[in-house]
Protein backbone atom coordinates (compact mmCIF):
# COMPACT_ATOMS: atom_id res chain seq x y z
CA UNK A 1 0.00 0.00 0.00
CA UNK A 2 1.00 3.63 -0.54
CA UNK A 3 0.95 5.46 2.80
CA UNK A 4 1.84 9.10 3.52
CA UNK A 5 2.63 9.97 7.14
CA UNK A 6 2.00 13.66 7.94
CA UNK A 7 3.21 15.07 11.26
CA UNK A 8 4.73 18.10 12.97
CA UNK A 9 7.49 15.98 14.52
CA UNK A 10 9.72 13.25 13.10
CA UNK A 11 12.57 11.83 15.17
CA UNK A 12 15.52 12.28 15.04
CA UNK A 13 15.04 15.46 12.98
CA UNK A 14 12.40 17.29 15.02
CA UNK A 15 11.17 15.91 18.31
CA UNK A 16 9.40 17.33 21.34
CA UNK A 17 7.47 14.29 22.55
CA UNK A 18 6.58 10.70 21.83
CA UNK A 19 4.82 11.51 18.56
CA UNK A 20 8.20 12.25 16.98
CA UNK A 21 9.49 8.83 18.02
CA UNK A 22 6.45 7.10 16.54
CA UNK A 23 6.60 8.89 13.19
CA UNK A 24 10.34 8.34 13.00
CA UNK A 25 10.18 4.59 13.65
CA UNK A 26 6.85 3.09 12.52
CA UNK A 27 7.45 3.91 8.81
CA UNK A 28 10.71 1.94 8.94
CA UNK A 29 8.91 -1.23 10.00
CA UNK A 30 6.11 -0.74 7.47
CA UNK A 31 8.80 -0.33 4.81
CA UNK A 32 10.41 -3.59 5.96
CA UNK A 33 7.02 -5.24 5.51
CA UNK A 34 6.87 -4.16 1.88
CA UNK A 35 4.78 -0.99 1.90
CA UNK A 36 5.56 2.25 0.05
CA UNK A 37 5.72 4.61 3.02
CA UNK A 38 6.69 8.28 2.81
CA UNK A 39 6.79 11.07 5.38
CA UNK A 40 5.68 14.72 5.09
CA UNK A 41 6.78 17.30 7.67
CA UNK A 42 7.55 21.04 7.95
CA UNK A 43 10.96 22.21 6.74
CA UNK A 44 12.00 23.80 10.04
CA UNK A 45 14.98 26.12 10.08
CA UNK A 46 17.19 23.56 11.84
CA UNK A 47 16.50 20.58 9.54
CA UNK A 48 19.30 21.52 7.16
CA UNK A 49 21.77 21.15 10.04
CA UNK A 50 20.87 17.47 10.39
CA UNK A 51 20.43 16.09 6.87
CA UNK A 52 21.33 17.00 3.31
CA UNK A 53 18.45 18.65 1.49
CA UNK A 54 18.60 19.41 -2.26
CA UNK A 55 18.33 23.09 -3.11
CA UNK A 56 15.72 22.51 -5.80
CA UNK A 57 12.19 21.51 -4.77
CA UNK A 58 10.46 18.47 -6.24
CA UNK A 59 7.13 20.29 -6.36
CA UNK A 60 5.63 23.73 -5.84
CA UNK A 61 2.09 24.50 -4.84
CA UNK A 62 -0.35 26.97 -3.35
CA UNK A 63 -2.49 26.76 -0.23
CA UNK A 64 -4.46 29.46 1.57
CA UNK A 65 -3.29 31.99 -1.06
CA UNK A 66 0.35 31.27 -0.15
CA UNK A 67 3.05 29.74 -2.34
CA UNK A 68 5.08 26.87 -0.91
CA UNK A 69 7.73 24.41 -2.09
CA UNK A 70 8.31 20.76 -1.22
CA UNK A 71 11.84 19.38 -0.98
CA UNK A 72 12.72 15.70 -0.93
CA UNK A 73 15.30 14.01 1.24
CA UNK A 74 15.24 10.70 3.15
CA UNK A 75 14.71 9.65 6.73
CA UNK A 76 18.21 9.23 8.20
CA UNK A 77 19.80 5.85 7.46
CA UNK A 78 16.83 4.68 5.37
CA UNK A 79 15.50 4.76 1.83
CA UNK A 80 12.18 6.21 2.98
CA UNK A 81 11.38 9.46 1.11
CA UNK A 82 11.01 12.49 3.36
CA UNK A 83 9.08 15.47 1.99
CA UNK A 84 9.82 18.83 3.58
CA UNK A 85 7.16 21.56 3.39
CA UNK A 86 9.06 24.76 2.76
CA UNK A 87 7.72 28.23 3.57
CA UNK A 88 9.10 31.20 5.57
CA UNK A 89 6.50 30.50 8.28
CA UNK A 90 8.60 27.47 9.29
CA UNK A 91 12.05 29.01 8.91
CA UNK A 92 12.49 29.59 12.63
CA UNK A 93 14.27 27.12 14.89
CA UNK A 94 11.16 26.35 16.91
CA UNK A 95 8.53 23.68 16.36
CA UNK A 96 5.70 25.01 18.51
CA UNK A 97 4.66 28.30 20.03
CA UNK A 98 3.89 31.76 18.75
CA UNK A 99 0.69 33.57 17.94
CA UNK A 100 0.68 32.13 14.42
CA UNK A 101 0.80 28.47 15.48
CA UNK A 102 -2.78 27.69 14.47
CA UNK A 103 -2.36 29.37 11.09
CA UNK A 104 0.99 27.68 10.42
CA UNK A 105 -0.30 24.16 10.96
CA UNK A 106 -3.56 24.81 9.10
CA UNK A 107 -1.43 26.00 6.18
CA UNK A 108 0.88 22.99 6.53
CA UNK A 109 -2.09 20.60 6.54
CA UNK A 110 -3.61 22.28 3.50
CA UNK A 111 -0.25 22.01 1.74
CA UNK A 112 -0.01 18.30 2.55
CA UNK A 113 -3.48 17.76 1.10
CA UNK A 114 -2.57 19.65 -2.08
CA UNK A 115 0.62 17.59 -2.37
CA UNK A 116 -1.35 14.35 -2.06
CA UNK A 117 -3.92 15.45 -4.60
CA UNK A 118 -1.50 16.79 -7.17
CA UNK A 119 1.95 15.18 -6.81
CA UNK A 120 2.40 11.88 -4.97
CA UNK A 121 -0.99 10.27 -4.51
CA UNK A 122 -1.16 7.83 -1.61
CA UNK A 123 -3.93 5.39 -0.86
CA UNK A 124 -3.86 6.46 2.79
CA UNK A 125 -2.78 9.59 4.64
CA UNK A 126 -1.85 8.82 8.24
CA UNK A 127 -2.33 12.04 10.23
CA UNK A 128 -0.90 12.66 13.69
CA UNK A 129 -2.44 14.89 16.37
CA UNK A 130 -4.14 18.26 16.05
CA UNK A 131 -1.48 19.79 13.80
CA UNK A 132 -2.81 17.64 10.93
CA UNK A 133 -6.43 17.53 12.03
CA UNK A 134 -7.78 19.46 9.04
CA UNK A 135 -6.56 16.84 6.56
CA UNK A 136 -9.37 14.32 7.29
CA UNK A 137 -11.89 17.15 6.91
CA UNK A 138 -10.59 18.13 3.47
CA UNK A 139 -10.09 14.52 2.36
CA UNK A 140 -13.54 13.40 3.44
CA UNK A 141 -14.94 13.98 -0.05
CA UNK A 142 -11.97 12.34 -1.78
CA UNK A 143 -13.07 8.90 -3.03
CA UNK A 144 -9.61 7.42 -3.51
CA UNK A 145 -7.54 8.73 -0.55
CA UNK A 146 -8.49 7.45 2.90
CA UNK A 147 -7.34 8.98 6.19
CA UNK A 148 -6.25 7.51 9.51
CA UNK A 149 -5.99 9.95 12.42
CA UNK A 150 -3.89 9.06 15.47
CA UNK A 151 -4.48 10.74 18.83
CA UNK A 152 -1.17 10.86 20.66
CA UNK A 153 -2.43 13.08 23.48
CA UNK A 154 -6.04 14.22 23.65
CA UNK A 155 -5.15 17.01 26.08
CA UNK A 156 -3.53 19.02 23.26
CA UNK A 157 -6.30 19.95 20.84
CA UNK A 158 -4.90 23.09 19.24
CA UNK A 159 -5.53 26.86 19.59
CA UNK A 160 -8.06 27.01 16.79
CA UNK A 161 -11.34 28.59 17.73
CA UNK A 162 -10.77 32.26 16.99
CA UNK A 163 -8.81 31.57 13.82
CA UNK A 164 -11.28 29.23 12.15
CA UNK A 165 -14.18 31.59 12.63
CA UNK A 166 -12.36 34.20 10.50
CA UNK A 167 -11.58 31.86 7.58
CA UNK A 168 -14.16 32.16 4.84
CA UNK A 169 -12.75 29.02 3.16
CA UNK A 170 -13.30 26.92 6.29
CA UNK A 171 -16.10 24.32 5.92
CA UNK A 172 -19.35 25.35 7.56
CA UNK A 173 -19.21 22.49 10.08
CA UNK A 174 -15.86 23.74 11.40
CA UNK A 175 -17.01 27.25 12.29
CA UNK A 176 -16.20 27.81 15.96
CA UNK A 177 -15.41 24.13 16.41
CA UNK A 178 -12.50 22.02 17.63
CA UNK A 179 -10.22 20.75 14.88
CA UNK A 180 -9.37 17.54 16.73
CA UNK A 181 -13.07 16.83 17.14
CA UNK A 182 -13.52 17.35 13.40
CA UNK A 183 -10.63 15.00 12.62
CA UNK A 184 -12.16 12.34 14.88
CA UNK A 185 -15.48 12.77 13.11
CA UNK A 186 -14.24 12.77 9.51
CA UNK A 187 -11.26 10.38 9.49
CA UNK A 188 -11.97 6.95 8.05
CA UNK A 189 -10.45 5.44 11.19
CA UNK A 190 -9.20 6.90 14.47
CA UNK A 191 -6.43 5.25 16.47
CA UNK A 192 -4.76 6.04 19.71
CA UNK A 193 -1.55 4.79 21.22
CA UNK A 194 -2.65 2.11 23.68
CA UNK A 195 -5.73 -0.07 24.21
CA UNK A 196 -6.32 1.22 27.75
CA UNK A 197 -6.13 4.88 26.69
CA UNK A 198 -8.65 4.16 23.91
CA UNK A 199 -11.10 3.07 26.61
CA UNK A 200 -10.23 5.82 29.08
CA UNK A 201 -10.79 8.71 26.67
CA UNK A 202 -14.42 7.65 26.35
CA UNK A 203 -14.95 8.68 29.99
CA UNK A 204 -15.26 12.17 31.56
CA UNK A 205 -12.09 11.64 33.61
CA UNK A 206 -9.88 11.39 30.52
CA UNK A 207 -12.01 12.55 27.59
CA UNK A 208 -11.04 16.26 27.68
CA UNK A 209 -14.67 17.17 26.82
CA UNK A 210 -14.63 14.90 23.74
CA UNK A 211 -15.71 11.73 25.58
CA UNK A 212 -19.24 11.96 24.17
CA UNK A 213 -18.02 12.08 20.58
CA UNK A 214 -15.44 9.35 21.16
CA UNK A 215 -17.97 7.10 22.86
CA UNK A 216 -20.48 7.68 20.06
CA UNK A 217 -17.83 6.78 17.45
CA UNK A 218 -16.23 4.01 19.53
CA UNK A 219 -16.73 1.50 16.72
CA UNK A 220 -14.31 3.56 14.63
CA UNK A 221 -11.71 3.90 17.42
CA UNK A 222 -8.90 1.42 18.05
CA UNK A 223 -6.00 1.48 20.51
CA UNK A 224 -2.69 0.20 19.12
CA UNK A 225 0.24 0.06 21.49
CA UNK A 226 3.28 2.13 20.59
CA UNK A 227 6.64 0.48 20.19
CA UNK A 228 10.20 1.76 20.23
CA UNK A 229 12.93 1.62 17.63
CA UNK A 230 14.89 -1.33 18.94
CA UNK A 231 17.83 -0.61 16.66
CA UNK A 232 18.30 2.86 18.15
CA UNK A 233 17.49 1.88 21.73
CA UNK A 234 19.77 -1.13 22.03
CA UNK A 235 22.08 -1.36 25.07
CA UNK A 236 24.21 -3.95 23.28
CA UNK A 237 25.21 -1.43 20.59
CA UNK A 238 24.43 2.05 21.95
CA UNK A 239 27.38 4.36 21.30
CA UNK A 240 26.05 6.94 23.77
CA UNK A 241 26.53 4.79 26.88
CA UNK A 242 29.81 4.01 28.63
CA UNK A 243 29.61 0.22 28.49
CA UNK A 244 27.42 -1.88 26.22
CA UNK A 245 25.62 -4.87 27.72
CA UNK A 246 22.65 -7.18 27.22
CA UNK A 247 20.36 -9.32 29.35
CA UNK A 248 23.04 -12.01 29.60
CA UNK A 249 25.82 -9.65 30.68
CA UNK A 250 24.20 -7.52 33.36
CA UNK A 251 27.41 -7.54 35.38
CA UNK A 252 28.70 -4.95 32.89
CA UNK A 253 25.77 -2.63 33.62
CA UNK A 254 27.18 -1.39 36.93
CA UNK A 255 29.87 0.49 35.01
CA UNK A 256 27.11 2.62 33.48
CA UNK A 257 25.74 3.28 36.95
CA UNK A 258 29.10 4.57 38.14
CA UNK A 259 29.47 6.62 34.94
CA UNK A 260 26.10 8.37 35.35
CA UNK A 261 26.85 9.05 39.03
CA UNK A 262 30.10 10.71 38.00
CA UNK A 263 28.48 12.65 35.14
CA UNK A 264 25.68 14.08 37.28
CA UNK A 265 27.74 14.77 40.41
CA UNK A 266 26.30 12.03 42.61
CA UNK A 267 28.37 10.13 45.14
CA UNK A 268 29.91 6.98 43.67
CA UNK A 269 27.97 4.25 45.43
CA UNK A 270 27.09 1.09 43.53
CA UNK A 271 24.93 -0.12 46.42
CA UNK A 272 22.62 2.91 46.50
CA UNK A 273 19.46 2.53 44.42
CA UNK A 274 19.52 5.20 41.71
CA UNK A 275 16.07 6.49 40.70
CA UNK A 276 15.82 8.06 37.25
CA UNK A 277 13.18 10.43 35.89
CA UNK A 278 13.26 11.55 32.26
CA UNK A 279 10.15 13.61 31.57
CA UNK A 280 8.53 16.91 30.86
CA UNK A 281 8.26 18.57 34.26
CA UNK A 282 4.50 19.10 34.14
CA UNK A 283 1.51 17.96 36.18
CA UNK A 284 0.58 15.23 33.67
CA UNK A 285 3.83 13.44 34.47
CA UNK A 286 3.12 13.35 38.21
CA UNK A 287 5.82 15.82 39.19
CA UNK A 288 3.62 17.19 41.98
CA UNK A 289 3.56 13.69 43.53
CA UNK A 290 7.34 13.47 43.30
CA UNK A 291 7.77 16.82 45.07
CA UNK A 292 5.35 15.84 47.85
CA UNK A 293 7.13 12.58 48.74
CA UNK A 294 10.72 13.41 47.90
CA UNK A 295 11.90 14.63 51.31
CA UNK A 296 10.36 11.66 53.05
CA UNK A 297 11.71 9.11 50.57
CA UNK A 298 15.23 10.50 50.55
CA UNK A 299 15.26 10.55 54.37
CA UNK A 300 13.83 7.04 54.70
CA UNK A 301 16.20 5.40 52.19
CA UNK A 302 19.78 5.82 51.01
CA UNK A 303 18.62 6.17 47.40
CA UNK A 304 19.88 8.66 44.84
CA UNK A 305 17.78 10.56 42.30
CA UNK A 306 18.47 11.91 38.80
CA UNK A 307 15.87 14.13 37.13
CA UNK A 308 16.25 15.08 33.46
CA UNK A 309 13.81 17.38 31.68
CA UNK A 310 12.25 20.82 31.43
CA UNK A 311 8.75 22.10 31.98
CA UNK A 312 6.75 24.35 34.25
CA UNK A 313 8.95 26.96 35.89
CA UNK A 314 7.57 26.41 39.39
CA UNK A 315 8.38 22.69 39.22
CA UNK A 316 11.87 23.41 37.93
CA UNK A 317 12.49 25.85 40.79
CA UNK A 318 11.19 23.50 43.49
CA UNK A 319 13.23 20.55 42.23
CA UNK A 320 16.36 22.65 41.96
CA UNK A 321 15.91 23.84 45.55
CA UNK A 322 15.31 20.30 46.78
CA UNK A 323 18.49 19.08 45.07
CA UNK A 324 20.47 21.55 47.16
CA UNK A 325 19.20 19.82 50.30
CA UNK A 326 20.58 16.47 49.15
CA UNK A 327 24.05 17.17 47.75
CA UNK A 328 25.64 14.09 46.24
CA UNK A 329 22.32 12.26 46.29
CA UNK A 330 20.07 14.28 43.99
CA UNK A 331 20.87 15.74 40.58
CA UNK A 332 18.55 17.90 38.46
CA UNK A 333 19.42 18.49 34.80
CA UNK A 334 17.00 21.04 33.30
CA UNK A 335 17.43 20.09 29.67
CA UNK A 336 16.36 17.69 26.91
CA UNK A 337 19.20 15.48 25.76
CA UNK A 338 18.61 12.12 24.08
CA UNK A 339 22.15 10.86 24.66
CA UNK A 340 22.02 11.73 28.37
CA UNK A 341 18.59 10.16 28.71
CA UNK A 342 19.99 6.88 27.38
CA UNK A 343 22.79 7.04 29.93
CA UNK A 344 20.15 7.50 32.64
CA UNK A 345 18.25 4.44 31.36
CA UNK A 346 21.50 2.45 31.26
CA UNK A 347 22.76 3.53 34.69
CA UNK A 348 19.73 4.08 36.93
CA UNK A 349 18.29 1.11 38.80
CA UNK A 350 14.65 2.17 38.65
CA UNK A 351 12.66 4.57 36.48
CA UNK A 352 9.89 6.58 38.15
CA UNK A 353 6.83 7.45 36.04
CA UNK A 354 3.88 8.37 38.33
CA UNK A 355 1.76 9.94 35.58
CA UNK A 356 -1.64 11.50 36.19
CA UNK A 357 -2.54 10.23 32.72
CA UNK A 358 -0.39 8.61 30.05
CA UNK A 359 -1.66 7.85 26.52
CA UNK A 360 1.10 5.28 26.03
CA UNK A 361 4.45 6.39 27.31
CA UNK A 362 7.71 5.46 25.64
CA UNK A 363 10.17 6.23 28.42
CA UNK A 364 9.16 3.18 30.45
CA UNK A 365 9.73 0.99 27.36
CA UNK A 366 13.17 2.48 26.79
CA UNK A 367 14.01 2.08 30.47
CA UNK A 368 13.03 -1.60 30.47
CA UNK A 369 15.05 -2.16 27.31
CA UNK A 370 18.10 -0.98 29.30
CA UNK A 371 17.33 -3.00 32.43
CA UNK A 372 15.99 -0.02 34.40
CA UNK A 373 12.94 -1.21 36.35
CA UNK A 374 9.82 1.00 36.05
CA UNK A 375 7.76 2.29 38.96
CA UNK A 376 4.49 3.48 37.40
CA UNK A 377 0.98 4.57 38.17
CA UNK A 378 -1.43 2.27 36.37
CA UNK A 379 -3.03 4.52 33.77
CA UNK A 380 -3.25 4.47 29.98
CA UNK A 381 -0.40 2.70 28.25
CA UNK A 382 1.38 2.08 31.55
CA UNK A 383 -1.32 -0.52 32.29
CA UNK A 384 -0.59 -2.22 28.97
CA UNK A 385 3.21 -2.23 29.24
CA UNK A 386 4.21 -2.74 32.89
CA UNK A 387 3.02 -5.75 34.91
CA UNK A 388 3.12 -6.20 38.69
CA UNK A 389 6.35 -7.71 39.99
CA UNK A 390 5.75 -11.04 41.73
CA UNK A 391 9.05 -12.34 43.17
CA UNK A 392 7.52 -15.61 44.41
CA UNK A 393 6.29 -16.68 40.98
CA UNK A 394 9.10 -14.85 39.18
CA UNK A 395 6.66 -12.82 37.09
CA UNK A 396 6.11 -9.18 36.21
CA UNK A 397 8.31 -6.35 35.01
CA UNK A 398 7.90 -3.49 37.47
CA UNK A 399 6.29 -1.83 40.47
CA UNK A 400 2.80 -0.37 40.08
CA UNK A 401 0.27 1.65 42.07
CA UNK A 402 -3.29 2.65 41.22
CA UNK A 403 -4.39 5.78 43.06
CA UNK A 404 -2.91 9.17 42.23
CA UNK A 405 -1.92 9.74 45.86
CA UNK A 406 1.46 10.61 47.44
CA UNK A 407 1.28 7.69 49.89
CA UNK A 408 0.67 5.17 47.10
CA UNK A 409 3.62 6.48 45.09
CA UNK A 410 5.85 6.49 48.18
CA UNK A 411 4.86 2.91 49.04
CA UNK A 412 5.68 1.66 45.54
CA UNK A 413 9.08 3.34 45.67
CA UNK A 414 9.89 1.82 49.06
CA UNK A 415 8.84 -1.62 47.79
CA UNK A 416 11.28 -1.19 44.91
CA UNK A 417 14.03 -0.07 47.30
CA UNK A 418 13.45 -3.16 49.44
CA UNK A 419 13.40 -5.44 46.40
CA UNK A 420 16.62 -3.93 45.08
CA UNK A 421 18.55 -5.45 48.00
CA UNK A 422 17.85 -9.01 46.78
CA UNK A 423 20.36 -9.01 43.94
CA UNK A 424 19.63 -12.43 42.41
CA UNK A 425 15.88 -11.78 42.21
CA UNK A 426 16.52 -8.26 40.96
CA UNK A 427 18.66 -9.53 38.12
CA UNK A 428 15.90 -11.91 37.03
CA UNK A 429 13.47 -8.97 37.10
CA UNK A 430 15.85 -6.96 34.92
CA UNK A 431 16.16 -9.81 32.43
CA UNK A 432 12.38 -10.16 32.11
CA UNK A 433 12.04 -6.43 31.53
CA UNK A 434 14.83 -6.39 28.93
CA UNK A 435 13.37 -9.37 27.05
CA UNK A 436 9.82 -8.02 26.88
CA UNK A 437 8.86 -7.37 23.26
CA UNK A 438 8.17 -3.67 22.72
CA UNK A 439 9.39 -3.60 19.14
CA UNK A 440 7.11 -2.17 16.46
CA UNK A 441 6.56 -5.43 14.58
CA UNK A 442 3.32 -6.66 16.17
CA UNK A 443 1.86 -3.16 16.38
CA UNK A 444 2.79 -2.53 12.74
CA UNK A 445 0.69 -5.57 11.90
CA UNK A 446 -2.28 -3.97 13.70
CA UNK A 447 -1.80 -0.76 11.70
CA UNK A 448 -1.70 -2.76 8.47
CA UNK A 449 -5.10 -4.22 9.39
CA UNK A 450 -6.43 -0.69 9.92
CA UNK A 451 -4.99 0.49 6.60
CA UNK A 452 -6.59 -2.43 4.80
CA UNK A 453 -9.93 -1.68 6.41
CA UNK A 454 -10.03 1.98 5.33
CA UNK A 455 -9.40 1.03 1.68
CA UNK A 456 -12.12 -1.61 1.70
CA UNK A 457 -10.03 -4.74 2.16
CA UNK A 458 -10.50 -7.44 4.83
CA UNK A 459 -8.85 -6.37 8.08
CA UNK A 460 -6.51 -9.32 8.34
CA UNK A 461 -2.88 -10.12 7.65
CA UNK A 462 -1.91 -12.42 4.83
CA UNK A 463 0.06 -15.59 5.71
CA UNK A 464 3.12 -13.95 4.14
CA UNK A 465 2.71 -10.86 6.34
CA UNK A 466 2.25 -13.02 9.44
CA UNK A 467 5.39 -14.97 8.58
CA UNK A 468 7.43 -11.82 7.98
CA UNK A 469 6.34 -10.24 11.27
CA UNK A 470 7.16 -13.45 13.15
CA UNK A 471 10.57 -13.54 11.48
CA UNK A 472 11.34 -9.92 12.39
CA UNK A 473 10.12 -10.42 15.96
CA UNK A 474 12.31 -13.49 16.36
CA UNK A 475 15.34 -11.60 15.05
CA UNK A 476 14.71 -8.81 17.58
CA UNK A 477 14.61 -11.23 20.48
Swiss-Prot record:
Keyword Glycosyltransferase in record: yes
Biochemical pathway: Glycan biosynthesis; glycogen biosynthesis
Classification via Gene3D superfamilies: Glycogen Phosphorylase B
Broad enzyme group: transferase
InterPro entries the record matches: Glyco_trans_1 (IPR001296), GS/SS (IPR011835), Starch_synth_cat_dom (IPR013534)
Superkingdom field: Bacteria
Enzyme nomenclature, EC number: 2.4.1.21
UniProt keyword terms in alphabetical order: Glycogen biosynthesis, Glycosyltransferase, Transferase
Species of origin: Synechocystis sp. (strain ATCC 27184 / PCC 6803 / Kazusa)
Amino-acid positions noted as binding ADP-alpha-D-glucose in the UniProt annotation, renumbered to this chain: 15
Protein name (Swiss-Prot/TrEMBL): Glycogen synthase 1
GO molecular function, one term: alpha-1,4-glucan glucosyltransferase (ADP-glucose donor) activity
Reactions mediated catalytically: [(1->4)-alpha-D-glucosyl](n) + ADP-alpha-D-glucose = [(1->4)-alpha-D-glucosyl](n+1) + ADP + H(+)
CDD domains, per database record: GT5_Glycogen_synthase_DULL1-like
Function text: Synthesizes alpha-1,4-glucan chains using ADP-glucose.
Family, as annotated: Belongs to the glycosyltransferase 1 family. Bacterial/plant glycogen synthase subfamily.
Pfam families cross-referenced by the UniProt entry: Glyco_transf_5, Glycos_transf_1
Record's keyword annotation contains Glycosyltransferase: yes
Amino acid sequence: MKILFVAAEVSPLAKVGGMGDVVGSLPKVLHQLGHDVRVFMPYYGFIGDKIDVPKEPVWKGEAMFQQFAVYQSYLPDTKIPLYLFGHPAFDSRRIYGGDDEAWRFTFFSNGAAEFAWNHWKPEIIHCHDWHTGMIPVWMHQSPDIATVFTIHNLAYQGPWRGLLETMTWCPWYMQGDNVMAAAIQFANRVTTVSPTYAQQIQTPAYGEKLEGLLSYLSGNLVGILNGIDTEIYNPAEDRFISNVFDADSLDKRVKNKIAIQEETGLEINRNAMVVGIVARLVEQKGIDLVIQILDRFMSYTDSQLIILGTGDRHYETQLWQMASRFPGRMAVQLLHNDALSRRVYAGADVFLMPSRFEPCGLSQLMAMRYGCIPIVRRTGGLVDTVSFYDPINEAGTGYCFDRYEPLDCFTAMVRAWEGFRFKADWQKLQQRAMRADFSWYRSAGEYIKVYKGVVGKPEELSPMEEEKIAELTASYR
